[in-house]
Protein backbone atom coordinates (compact mmCIF):
# COMPACT_ATOMS: atom_id res chain seq x y z
CA UNK A 1 0.00 0.00 0.00
CA UNK A 2 1.31 3.42 -0.92
CA UNK A 3 0.81 6.40 1.34
CA UNK A 4 0.26 9.92 0.14
CA UNK A 5 3.46 11.90 -0.02
CA UNK A 6 3.66 15.35 1.52
CA UNK A 7 4.20 18.13 -0.99
CA UNK A 8 2.89 15.97 -3.85
CA UNK A 9 1.01 17.40 -6.80
CA UNK A 10 -2.76 17.10 -7.00
CA UNK A 11 -4.64 18.29 -10.09
CA UNK A 12 -7.85 20.03 -9.00
CA UNK A 13 -10.32 20.62 -11.81
CA UNK A 14 -13.24 22.94 -11.08
CA UNK A 15 -16.32 22.99 -13.29
CA UNK A 16 -17.76 26.15 -14.76
CA UNK A 17 -20.79 26.20 -12.47
CA UNK A 18 -18.58 25.79 -9.38
CA UNK A 19 -16.49 28.78 -10.44
CA UNK A 20 -19.58 30.73 -11.46
CA UNK A 21 -21.58 30.16 -8.27
CA UNK A 22 -18.99 29.37 -5.61
CA UNK A 23 -15.64 31.01 -6.45
CA UNK A 24 -15.00 31.68 -2.76
CA UNK A 25 -15.48 27.99 -1.90
CA UNK A 26 -13.17 27.02 -4.78
CA UNK A 27 -10.47 29.34 -3.46
CA UNK A 28 -10.81 27.93 0.07
CA UNK A 29 -10.49 24.35 -1.24
CA UNK A 30 -7.27 25.25 -3.06
CA UNK A 31 -5.96 27.13 -0.03
CA UNK A 32 -6.75 24.19 2.25
CA UNK A 33 -4.93 21.76 -0.05
CA UNK A 34 -1.84 23.97 -0.10
CA UNK A 35 -1.83 24.48 3.66
CA UNK A 36 -2.34 20.74 4.09
CA UNK A 37 0.94 19.93 2.37
CA UNK A 38 -0.24 19.31 -1.20
CA UNK A 39 0.86 21.16 -4.32
CA UNK A 40 -2.43 21.99 -6.04
CA UNK A 41 -2.53 22.54 -9.79
CA UNK A 42 -5.86 24.26 -10.47
CA UNK A 43 -7.61 23.63 -13.80
CA UNK A 44 -10.53 25.94 -14.60
CA UNK A 45 -13.52 25.54 -16.87
CA UNK A 46 -15.29 28.56 -18.32
CA UNK A 47 -17.66 30.22 -15.82
CA UNK A 48 -21.36 29.47 -15.81
CA UNK A 49 -23.81 30.85 -13.28
CA UNK A 50 -26.60 28.44 -14.15
CA UNK A 51 -27.65 26.44 -17.19
CA UNK A 52 -25.00 25.69 -19.82
CA UNK A 53 -26.92 27.63 -22.44
CA UNK A 54 -26.24 30.83 -20.47
CA UNK A 55 -22.61 29.99 -19.66
CA UNK A 56 -19.54 31.75 -21.03
CA UNK A 57 -18.72 28.94 -23.48
CA UNK A 58 -22.23 28.99 -24.93
CA UNK A 59 -22.01 32.78 -25.33
CA UNK A 60 -18.64 32.46 -27.06
CA UNK A 61 -20.13 29.90 -29.43
CA UNK A 62 -22.78 32.53 -30.17
CA UNK A 63 -19.95 34.91 -31.06
CA UNK A 64 -18.50 32.27 -33.38
CA UNK A 65 -21.81 31.57 -35.12
CA UNK A 66 -22.52 35.29 -35.50
CA UNK A 67 -19.07 35.86 -36.99
CA UNK A 68 -19.63 33.06 -39.49
CA UNK A 69 -22.85 34.75 -40.54
CA UNK A 70 -21.05 38.08 -40.93
CA UNK A 71 -18.29 36.64 -43.13
CA UNK A 72 -20.84 34.74 -45.24
CA UNK A 73 -22.74 37.90 -46.33
CA UNK A 74 -19.99 40.17 -47.64
CA UNK A 75 -22.41 41.43 -50.29
CA UNK A 76 -24.68 42.99 -47.64
CA UNK A 77 -22.64 45.47 -45.54
CA UNK A 78 -25.70 46.81 -43.71
CA UNK A 79 -26.64 43.35 -42.46
CA UNK A 80 -22.99 42.70 -41.63
CA UNK A 81 -22.89 45.77 -39.41
CA UNK A 82 -26.16 44.80 -37.74
CA UNK A 83 -24.77 41.36 -36.91
CA UNK A 84 -21.49 42.86 -35.73
CA UNK A 85 -23.40 45.09 -33.31
CA UNK A 86 -24.98 41.93 -31.92
CA UNK A 87 -21.54 40.31 -31.65
CA UNK A 88 -20.14 43.33 -29.81
CA UNK A 89 -23.08 43.20 -27.42
CA UNK A 90 -22.40 39.54 -26.55
CA UNK A 91 -18.73 40.25 -25.84
CA UNK A 92 -19.68 43.30 -23.77
CA UNK A 93 -22.10 41.17 -21.72
CA UNK A 94 -19.36 38.59 -21.12
CA UNK A 95 -16.97 41.32 -19.97
CA UNK A 96 -19.52 43.00 -17.71
CA UNK A 97 -20.46 39.68 -16.09
CA UNK A 98 -16.82 38.85 -15.36
CA UNK A 99 -16.08 42.34 -14.02
CA UNK A 100 -19.14 42.28 -11.76
CA UNK A 101 -17.96 38.99 -10.26
CA UNK A 102 -14.50 40.42 -9.57
CA UNK A 103 -16.04 43.47 -7.91
CA UNK A 104 -18.23 41.25 -5.77
CA UNK A 105 -15.58 38.86 -4.47
CA UNK A 106 -12.17 40.59 -4.52
CA UNK A 107 -11.52 42.72 -1.43
CA UNK A 108 -8.12 44.24 -2.15
CA UNK A 109 -8.38 47.27 -4.43
CA UNK A 110 -5.03 46.70 -6.19
CA UNK A 111 -5.85 43.09 -7.06
CA UNK A 112 -9.37 44.04 -8.13
CA UNK A 113 -8.19 46.84 -10.44
CA UNK A 114 -5.43 44.70 -11.94
CA UNK A 115 -7.82 41.82 -12.65
CA UNK A 116 -10.43 44.08 -14.24
CA UNK A 117 -7.73 45.49 -16.55
CA UNK A 118 -6.74 41.96 -17.57
CA UNK A 119 -10.34 40.92 -18.23
CA UNK A 120 -10.99 44.08 -20.25
CA UNK A 121 -7.83 43.45 -22.30
CA UNK A 122 -8.83 39.82 -22.96
CA UNK A 123 -12.29 40.85 -24.18
CA UNK A 124 -10.79 43.60 -26.34
CA UNK A 125 -8.44 41.02 -27.89
CA UNK A 126 -11.43 38.86 -28.76
CA UNK A 127 -13.26 41.83 -30.26
CA UNK A 128 -10.18 42.83 -32.28
CA UNK A 129 -9.91 39.29 -33.63
CA UNK A 130 -13.53 39.24 -34.78
CA UNK A 131 -13.14 42.70 -36.30
CA UNK A 132 -10.09 41.55 -38.28
CA UNK A 133 -11.96 38.45 -39.44
CA UNK A 134 -14.80 40.65 -40.70
CA UNK A 135 -12.51 43.17 -42.35
CA UNK A 136 -10.26 40.65 -44.12
CA UNK A 137 -12.93 37.99 -44.70
CA UNK A 138 -10.94 35.35 -42.83
CA UNK A 139 -11.86 31.67 -42.91
CA UNK A 140 -14.01 31.02 -39.83
CA UNK A 141 -13.15 27.36 -39.32
CA UNK A 142 -12.57 24.99 -36.41
CA UNK A 143 -9.35 26.75 -35.46
CA UNK A 144 -11.20 30.07 -35.30
CA UNK A 145 -13.86 28.46 -33.10
CA UNK A 146 -11.14 27.15 -30.78
CA UNK A 147 -9.56 30.58 -30.49
CA UNK A 148 -12.85 32.24 -29.56
CA UNK A 149 -13.98 29.56 -27.11
CA UNK A 150 -10.59 29.56 -25.34
CA UNK A 151 -11.33 33.01 -23.89
CA UNK A 152 -13.86 31.46 -21.49
CA UNK A 153 -11.22 29.51 -19.59
CA UNK A 154 -8.82 32.46 -19.69
CA UNK A 155 -11.38 34.69 -17.98
CA UNK A 156 -12.09 32.04 -15.32
CA UNK A 157 -8.39 31.79 -14.56
CA UNK A 158 -8.09 35.58 -14.21
CA UNK A 159 -10.78 35.44 -11.53
CA UNK A 160 -9.31 32.48 -9.65
CA UNK A 161 -5.79 33.93 -9.61
CA UNK A 162 -7.28 37.06 -8.04
CA UNK A 163 -9.30 34.99 -5.53
CA UNK A 164 -6.14 33.21 -4.36
CA UNK A 165 -3.97 36.33 -4.26
CA UNK A 166 -6.72 38.02 -2.25
CA UNK A 167 -6.17 35.24 0.33
CA UNK A 168 -2.39 35.72 0.34
CA UNK A 169 -1.83 32.57 -1.73
CA UNK A 170 0.75 33.23 -4.48
CA UNK A 171 -0.79 32.15 -7.78
CA UNK A 172 0.18 32.27 -11.45
CA UNK A 173 -2.00 32.42 -14.56
CA UNK A 174 -1.11 29.54 -16.94
CA UNK A 175 -2.49 29.72 -20.48
CA UNK A 176 -2.38 26.35 -22.31
CA UNK A 177 -4.59 27.44 -25.22
CA UNK A 178 -1.73 27.58 -27.73
CA UNK A 179 1.17 25.86 -26.00
CA UNK A 180 1.42 22.59 -27.99
CA UNK A 181 3.15 22.82 -31.40
CA UNK A 182 0.49 21.97 -33.98
CA UNK A 183 2.84 20.97 -36.82
CA UNK A 184 -0.02 21.97 -39.15
CA UNK A 185 -1.59 18.52 -38.86
CA UNK A 186 -5.31 18.02 -39.45
CA UNK A 187 -5.72 14.83 -37.41
CA UNK A 188 -4.71 13.72 -33.94
CA UNK A 189 -1.67 11.48 -33.83
CA UNK A 190 -1.57 8.64 -31.27
CA UNK A 191 1.32 10.33 -29.44
CA UNK A 192 -0.29 13.79 -29.26
CA UNK A 193 -1.52 13.39 -25.68
CA UNK A 194 1.86 12.16 -24.44
CA UNK A 195 3.55 15.19 -25.98
CA UNK A 196 0.89 17.51 -24.58
CA UNK A 197 1.26 16.07 -21.06
CA UNK A 198 5.02 16.63 -21.15
CA UNK A 199 4.61 20.24 -22.34
CA UNK A 200 1.94 20.94 -19.71
CA UNK A 201 4.07 19.49 -16.93
CA UNK A 202 7.10 21.54 -17.91
CA UNK A 203 5.07 24.76 -18.02
CA UNK A 204 3.41 24.14 -14.65
CA UNK A 205 6.69 23.24 -12.95
CA UNK A 206 8.00 26.65 -14.05
CA UNK A 207 5.60 28.35 -11.60
CA UNK A 208 8.26 27.88 -8.91
CA UNK A 209 6.13 27.58 -5.81
CA UNK A 210 3.18 29.65 -6.98
CA UNK A 211 -0.15 27.87 -7.40
CA UNK A 212 -0.66 27.32 -11.14
CA UNK A 213 -4.15 28.34 -12.27
CA UNK A 214 -4.50 26.62 -15.63
CA UNK A 215 -6.86 27.11 -18.56
CA UNK A 216 -8.91 23.95 -19.06
CA UNK A 217 -8.88 24.79 -22.76
CA UNK A 218 -5.66 23.55 -24.36
CA UNK A 219 -4.11 23.53 -27.80
CA UNK A 220 -3.20 23.66 -30.48
CA UNK A 221 -5.06 20.42 -31.17
CA UNK A 222 -4.68 19.08 -34.73
CA UNK A 223 -7.92 19.83 -36.54
CA UNK A 224 -9.75 21.42 -33.61
CA UNK A 225 -10.29 20.81 -29.91
CA UNK A 226 -14.03 21.49 -30.10
CA UNK A 227 -14.74 19.80 -33.44
CA UNK A 228 -12.41 16.82 -33.05
CA UNK A 229 -13.19 13.65 -31.12
CA UNK A 230 -12.52 15.57 -27.89
CA UNK A 231 -15.35 18.11 -27.89
CA UNK A 232 -16.81 19.79 -24.82
CA UNK A 233 -15.73 18.39 -21.48
CA UNK A 234 -12.12 18.93 -22.51
CA UNK A 235 -11.17 20.42 -19.14
CA UNK A 236 -11.44 16.95 -17.55
CA UNK A 237 -8.94 15.74 -20.12
CA UNK A 238 -6.71 18.73 -19.48
CA UNK A 239 -6.65 17.92 -15.76
CA UNK A 240 -5.53 14.35 -16.41
CA UNK A 241 -2.86 15.49 -18.88
CA UNK A 242 -1.55 17.99 -16.33
CA UNK A 243 -1.46 15.23 -13.70
CA UNK A 244 0.43 12.90 -16.04
CA UNK A 245 2.90 15.64 -16.94
CA UNK A 246 3.53 16.32 -13.24
CA UNK A 247 3.62 12.61 -12.29
CA UNK A 248 0.78 13.42 -9.92
CA UNK A 249 -1.09 10.59 -8.24
CA UNK A 250 -4.50 12.26 -7.97
CA UNK A 251 -7.01 14.21 -10.00
CA UNK A 252 -9.96 15.77 -8.23
CA UNK A 253 -13.02 16.65 -10.32
CA UNK A 254 -15.01 19.18 -8.31
CA UNK A 255 -18.74 19.48 -9.08
CA UNK A 256 -21.92 20.66 -7.34
CA UNK A 257 -22.98 17.12 -6.37
CA UNK A 258 -21.51 14.69 -3.83
CA UNK A 259 -20.04 12.37 -6.47
CA UNK A 260 -21.37 9.91 -9.05
CA UNK A 261 -24.89 8.69 -8.28
CA UNK A 262 -26.98 5.62 -9.02
CA UNK A 263 -29.16 8.01 -11.08
CA UNK A 264 -29.44 11.73 -11.67
CA UNK A 265 -30.48 13.05 -8.22
CA UNK A 266 -32.29 15.94 -9.89
CA UNK A 267 -34.72 13.43 -11.41
CA UNK A 268 -34.57 10.55 -8.93
CA UNK A 269 -34.89 11.74 -5.31
CA UNK A 270 -33.79 8.35 -3.92
CA UNK A 271 -30.54 8.23 -5.93
CA UNK A 272 -27.51 7.58 -3.75
CA UNK A 273 -23.85 8.46 -4.11
CA UNK A 274 -21.53 5.63 -5.15
CA UNK A 275 -18.32 5.31 -3.10
CA UNK A 276 -16.51 3.80 -6.09
CA UNK A 277 -17.02 3.00 -9.75
CA UNK A 278 -14.92 1.39 -12.49
CA UNK A 279 -13.55 3.43 -15.41
CA UNK A 280 -15.64 1.43 -17.89
CA UNK A 281 -18.81 2.12 -15.91
CA UNK A 282 -17.97 5.83 -15.71
CA UNK A 283 -17.35 5.93 -19.47
CA UNK A 284 -20.68 4.24 -20.22
CA UNK A 285 -22.57 6.62 -17.94
CA UNK A 286 -20.90 9.60 -19.60
CA UNK A 287 -21.79 8.39 -23.09
CA UNK A 288 -25.38 7.59 -22.19
CA UNK A 289 -26.35 10.89 -20.65
CA UNK A 290 -24.73 11.34 -17.23
CA UNK A 291 -22.14 14.10 -17.11
CA UNK A 292 -19.50 12.13 -15.24
CA UNK A 293 -15.94 12.33 -16.62
CA UNK A 294 -14.70 12.77 -20.20
CA UNK A 295 -14.08 9.33 -21.72
CA UNK A 296 -10.57 10.21 -22.92
CA UNK A 297 -9.67 11.48 -19.46
CA UNK A 298 -10.67 8.11 -18.01
CA UNK A 299 -8.70 6.20 -20.62
CA UNK A 300 -5.51 8.22 -20.20
CA UNK A 301 -5.72 8.14 -16.39
CA UNK A 302 -5.80 4.35 -16.34
CA UNK A 303 -3.09 3.98 -19.02
CA UNK A 304 -0.71 6.30 -17.16
CA UNK A 305 2.27 4.76 -15.37
CA UNK A 306 1.50 4.83 -12.51
CA UNK A 307 -2.24 5.17 -13.09
CA UNK A 308 -3.83 8.42 -11.97
CA UNK A 309 -6.65 8.14 -9.45
CA UNK A 310 -9.75 10.23 -10.11
CA UNK A 311 -11.99 11.54 -7.34
CA UNK A 312 -15.34 13.25 -7.95
CA UNK A 313 -16.20 15.58 -5.06
CA UNK A 314 -18.68 18.28 -4.07
CA UNK A 315 -17.36 21.83 -3.97
CA UNK A 316 -20.00 22.64 -1.34
CA UNK A 317 -19.02 19.66 0.85
CA UNK A 318 -15.25 19.31 0.47
CA UNK A 319 -15.11 17.08 3.56
CA UNK A 320 -17.31 14.45 1.87
CA UNK A 321 -15.91 11.16 0.59
CA UNK A 322 -17.15 11.61 -2.98
CA UNK A 323 -16.68 8.89 -5.58
CA UNK A 324 -13.37 7.34 -6.58
CA UNK A 325 -12.87 5.79 -10.01
CA UNK A 326 -11.31 2.40 -9.28
CA UNK A 327 -9.50 0.41 -12.00
CA UNK A 328 -10.71 -3.07 -12.89
CA UNK A 329 -8.70 -6.26 -12.54
CA UNK A 330 -7.35 -5.84 -16.06
CA UNK A 331 -5.64 -2.58 -15.16
CA UNK A 332 -2.23 -2.21 -13.57
CA UNK A 333 -3.14 -1.43 -9.97
CA UNK A 334 0.26 -1.97 -8.37
CA UNK A 335 0.71 1.75 -7.78
CA UNK A 336 -2.94 2.65 -7.22
CA UNK A 337 -3.31 4.60 -3.97
CA UNK A 338 -5.93 2.33 -2.43
CA UNK A 339 -5.44 3.91 0.97
CA UNK A 340 -7.50 6.85 -0.31
CA UNK A 341 -10.62 4.70 -0.39
CA UNK A 342 -13.14 4.42 2.41
CA UNK A 343 -11.24 2.67 5.21
CA UNK A 344 -14.42 0.84 6.16
CA UNK A 345 -14.38 -0.84 2.76
CA UNK A 346 -10.84 -2.15 2.41
CA UNK A 347 -11.87 -4.63 -0.29
CA UNK A 348 -13.54 -2.02 -2.49
CA UNK A 349 -10.94 -2.40 -5.24
CA UNK A 350 -11.64 -6.11 -5.57
CA UNK A 351 -14.14 -7.32 -8.14
CA UNK A 352 -15.28 -10.01 -5.70
CA UNK A 353 -16.51 -7.27 -3.37
CA UNK A 354 -18.80 -5.76 -5.98
CA UNK A 355 -22.43 -6.69 -5.32
CA UNK A 356 -24.22 -8.47 -8.12
CA UNK A 357 -26.50 -5.60 -8.90
CA UNK A 358 -26.46 -2.74 -11.42
CA UNK A 359 -24.30 0.27 -10.67
CA UNK A 360 -26.47 3.04 -12.12
CA UNK A 361 -29.31 3.88 -14.48
CA UNK A 362 -29.24 6.89 -16.78
CA UNK A 363 -31.21 8.71 -19.46
CA UNK A 364 -29.92 10.34 -22.65
CA UNK A 365 -32.46 12.73 -24.18
CA UNK A 366 -32.77 14.46 -27.58
CA UNK A 367 -32.73 11.15 -29.45
CA UNK A 368 -34.19 10.57 -32.91
CA UNK A 369 -34.72 7.08 -34.36
CA UNK A 370 -34.22 6.38 -38.05
CA UNK A 371 -35.77 3.10 -39.26
CA UNK A 372 -34.64 2.13 -42.79
CA UNK A 373 -36.00 -0.85 -44.74
CA UNK A 374 -33.96 -1.62 -47.86
CA UNK A 375 -35.91 -1.40 -51.12
CA UNK A 376 -33.28 -3.34 -53.05
CA UNK A 377 -32.29 -6.97 -53.32
CA UNK A 378 -28.60 -6.15 -52.86
CA UNK A 379 -26.42 -7.85 -50.28
CA UNK A 380 -26.87 -6.48 -46.78
CA UNK A 381 -23.30 -5.19 -46.50
CA UNK A 382 -23.82 -2.94 -49.52
CA UNK A 383 -26.97 -1.52 -47.97
CA UNK A 384 -25.19 -0.81 -44.68
CA UNK A 385 -22.22 0.81 -46.41
CA UNK A 386 -24.52 3.24 -48.21
CA UNK A 387 -26.45 4.08 -45.03
CA UNK A 388 -23.32 4.81 -43.00
CA UNK A 389 -21.74 6.75 -45.86
CA UNK A 390 -24.74 9.09 -45.84
CA UNK A 391 -24.43 9.55 -42.08
CA UNK A 392 -20.69 10.23 -42.37
CA UNK A 393 -21.34 12.89 -45.02
CA UNK A 394 -23.53 14.70 -42.48
CA UNK A 395 -21.08 14.18 -39.54
CA UNK A 396 -23.63 12.06 -37.68
CA UNK A 397 -22.63 9.35 -35.24
CA UNK A 398 -24.95 6.57 -34.07
CA UNK A 399 -25.60 5.98 -30.37
CA UNK A 400 -27.47 2.68 -30.70
CA UNK A 401 -28.10 0.38 -33.64
CA UNK A 402 -30.20 -2.71 -34.34
CA UNK A 403 -29.91 -4.55 -37.66
CA UNK A 404 -31.20 -7.40 -39.80
CA UNK A 405 -30.25 -8.28 -43.38
CA UNK A 406 -32.46 -5.62 -44.96
CA UNK A 407 -33.43 -3.41 -42.04
CA UNK A 408 -31.58 -1.07 -39.72
CA UNK A 409 -32.79 1.02 -36.77
CA UNK A 410 -30.50 3.77 -35.49
CA UNK A 411 -30.76 6.02 -32.45
CA UNK A 412 -29.04 9.35 -33.10
CA UNK A 413 -28.34 12.26 -30.78
CA UNK A 414 -30.21 15.12 -32.45
CA UNK A 415 -29.52 17.80 -29.82
CA UNK A 416 -27.25 19.70 -32.21
CA UNK A 417 -29.31 19.09 -35.35
CA UNK A 418 -31.97 21.45 -36.65
CA UNK A 419 -35.12 20.12 -38.40
CA UNK A 420 -33.69 20.89 -41.86
CA UNK A 421 -30.65 18.68 -41.20
CA UNK A 422 -32.86 15.80 -40.09
CA UNK A 423 -35.00 16.27 -43.21
CA UNK A 424 -31.92 16.26 -45.47
CA UNK A 425 -30.66 13.03 -43.93
CA UNK A 426 -34.10 11.48 -44.26
CA UNK A 427 -34.25 12.39 -47.96
CA UNK A 428 -30.82 10.90 -48.63
CA UNK A 429 -31.64 7.70 -46.76
CA UNK A 430 -34.92 7.43 -48.70
CA UNK A 431 -32.81 6.73 -51.80
CA UNK A 432 -31.84 3.42 -50.19
CA UNK A 433 -35.19 2.36 -48.79
CA UNK A 434 -38.31 3.16 -46.84
CA UNK A 435 -37.50 5.56 -43.99
CA UNK A 436 -39.45 6.13 -40.81
CA UNK A 437 -38.31 8.87 -38.39
CA UNK A 438 -39.29 8.92 -34.72
CA UNK A 439 -38.34 12.16 -32.93
CA UNK A 440 -38.58 13.02 -29.22
CA UNK A 441 -37.09 9.79 -27.93
CA UNK A 442 -34.66 8.95 -25.11
CA UNK A 443 -32.13 6.20 -24.40
CA UNK A 444 -32.62 4.46 -21.06
CA UNK A 445 -29.47 2.59 -19.97
CA UNK A 446 -28.73 0.22 -17.12
CA UNK A 447 -24.99 0.15 -16.38
CA UNK A 448 -22.93 -2.15 -14.17
CA UNK A 449 -19.74 -4.20 -14.23
CA UNK A 450 -21.68 -7.17 -12.83
CA UNK A 451 -24.50 -7.16 -15.40
CA UNK A 452 -22.79 -9.96 -17.35
CA UNK A 453 -23.11 -12.20 -14.27
CA UNK A 454 -26.73 -11.35 -13.53
CA UNK A 455 -29.01 -13.92 -15.13
CA UNK A 456 -32.34 -12.48 -16.18
CA UNK A 457 -31.52 -8.82 -15.55
CA UNK A 458 -32.53 -7.75 -19.08
CA UNK A 459 -35.87 -9.54 -18.76
CA UNK A 460 -36.47 -7.93 -15.38
CA UNK A 461 -35.67 -4.46 -16.75
CA UNK A 462 -38.06 -4.80 -19.69
CA UNK A 463 -40.76 -6.42 -17.55
CA UNK A 464 -40.72 -3.42 -15.19
CA UNK A 465 -41.14 -1.06 -18.15
CA UNK A 466 -43.87 -3.22 -19.70
CA UNK A 467 -45.87 -3.38 -16.47
CA UNK A 468 -45.97 0.43 -16.46
CA UNK A 469 -46.96 0.71 -20.16
CA UNK A 470 -43.66 2.22 -21.30
CA UNK A 471 -43.29 1.47 -25.00
CA UNK A 472 -39.84 0.23 -26.08
CA UNK A 473 -38.87 1.23 -29.63
CA UNK A 474 -35.36 -0.28 -29.70
CA UNK A 475 -33.27 -2.66 -27.59
CA UNK A 476 -29.48 -2.91 -27.58
CA UNK A 477 -27.38 -5.42 -25.65
CA UNK A 478 -24.12 -7.07 -26.61
CA UNK A 479 -21.81 -4.28 -27.77
CA UNK A 480 -20.87 -3.79 -24.12
CA UNK A 481 -21.10 -6.39 -21.38
CA UNK A 482 -21.78 -3.71 -18.81
CA UNK A 483 -24.69 -1.93 -20.46
CA UNK A 484 -28.28 -2.73 -21.41
CA UNK A 485 -30.02 0.06 -23.32
CA UNK A 486 -33.39 0.68 -24.87
CA UNK A 487 -35.07 3.61 -26.58
CA UNK A 488 -38.35 4.90 -25.19
CA UNK A 489 -40.52 8.00 -25.75
CA UNK A 490 -39.01 11.04 -24.06
CA UNK A 491 -42.33 11.81 -22.37
CA UNK A 492 -41.93 8.59 -20.36
CA UNK A 493 -38.22 9.03 -19.57
CA UNK A 494 -38.38 10.46 -16.04
CA UNK A 495 -41.13 8.02 -15.02
CA UNK A 496 -39.20 5.04 -16.41
CA UNK A 497 -35.98 6.18 -14.75
CA UNK A 498 -37.68 6.35 -11.34
CA UNK A 499 -39.44 3.00 -11.80
CA UNK A 500 -36.23 1.17 -12.64
CA UNK A 501 -34.32 2.84 -9.83
CA UNK A 502 -37.04 2.01 -7.32
CA UNK A 503 -37.23 -1.67 -8.30
CA UNK A 504 -33.55 -2.40 -8.95
CA UNK A 505 -31.82 -0.11 -6.45
CA UNK A 506 -34.10 1.22 -3.70
CA UNK A 507 -35.86 -2.09 -3.10
CA UNK A 508 -32.68 -4.05 -3.92
CA UNK A 509 -34.97 -6.53 -5.60
CA UNK A 510 -32.31 -8.45 -7.52
UniProtKB/Swiss-Prot annotation:
GO MF annotation list: aspartate kinase activity; ATP binding
Catalytic activity from the UniProt record: L-aspartate + ATP = 4-phospho-L-aspartate + ADP
Keywords recorded for this protein, A-Z: ATP-binding, Kinase, Nucleotide-binding, Phosphoprotein, Repeat, Transferase
Biotech uses: Fusaric acid is phytotoxic to plants such as cotton and banana. It has been shown to induce programmed cell death in plants. In addition to a mild toxicity to animals, fusaric acid exhibits acanthamoebicidal, antioomycete, and antimycobacterial activities.
Domain ACT: 372-440, 446-510
Primary gene name: FUB3
Changes seen on gene knockout: Impairs the production of fusaric acid.
UniProt-listed Enzyme Commission number(s): 2.7.2.4
Gene Ontology annotations for the cellular component aspect, listed alphabetically: cytosol
Domain of life of the organism encoding this protein: Eukaryota
Pfam families hit by this protein: AA_kinase (PF00696), ACT_9 (PF22468)
Task performed by this protein: Aspartate kinase; part of the gene cluster that mediates the biosynthesis of fusaric acid, a mycotoxin with low to moderate toxicity to animals and humans, but with high phytotoxic properties. L-aspartate is suggested as fusaric acid amino acid precursor that is activated and further processed to O-acetyl-L-homoserine by cluster enzymes aspartate kinase FUB3 and homoserine O-acetyltransferase FUB5, as well as enzymes of the primary metabolism.
Xref: PROSITE patterns: ACT
NCBIfam families reported in the protein's UniProt record: asp_kinases
Pathway(s): Mycotoxin biosynthesis
An individual GO BP term: lysine biosynthetic process via diaminopimelate
Entries under InterPro entries matching the protein: AceGlu_kinase-like_sf, ACT-like_dom_sf, ACT_Aspartokinase, ACT_dom, Asp/Glu/Uridylate_kinase, Asp_kin_monofn, Asp_kinase
Family: Belongs to the aspartokinase family.
Protein name (record): Aspartate kinase FUB3
Amino acid sequence: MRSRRDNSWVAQKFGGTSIGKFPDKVAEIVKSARLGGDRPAVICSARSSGKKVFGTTSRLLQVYRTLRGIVAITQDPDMQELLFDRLRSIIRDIRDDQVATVQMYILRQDIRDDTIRQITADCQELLDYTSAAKRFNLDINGKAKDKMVSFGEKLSCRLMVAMLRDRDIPAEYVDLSDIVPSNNLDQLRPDFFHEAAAVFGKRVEACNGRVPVITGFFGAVPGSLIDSGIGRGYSDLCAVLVAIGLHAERVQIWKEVDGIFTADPREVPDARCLPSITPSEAAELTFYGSEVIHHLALSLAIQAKPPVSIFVKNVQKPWGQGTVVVPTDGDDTSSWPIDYLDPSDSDSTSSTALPKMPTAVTIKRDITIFNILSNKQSMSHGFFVKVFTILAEHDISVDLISTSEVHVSMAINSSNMDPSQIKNVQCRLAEEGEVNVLPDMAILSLVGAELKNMTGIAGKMFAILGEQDVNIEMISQGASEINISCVIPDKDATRALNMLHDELFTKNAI
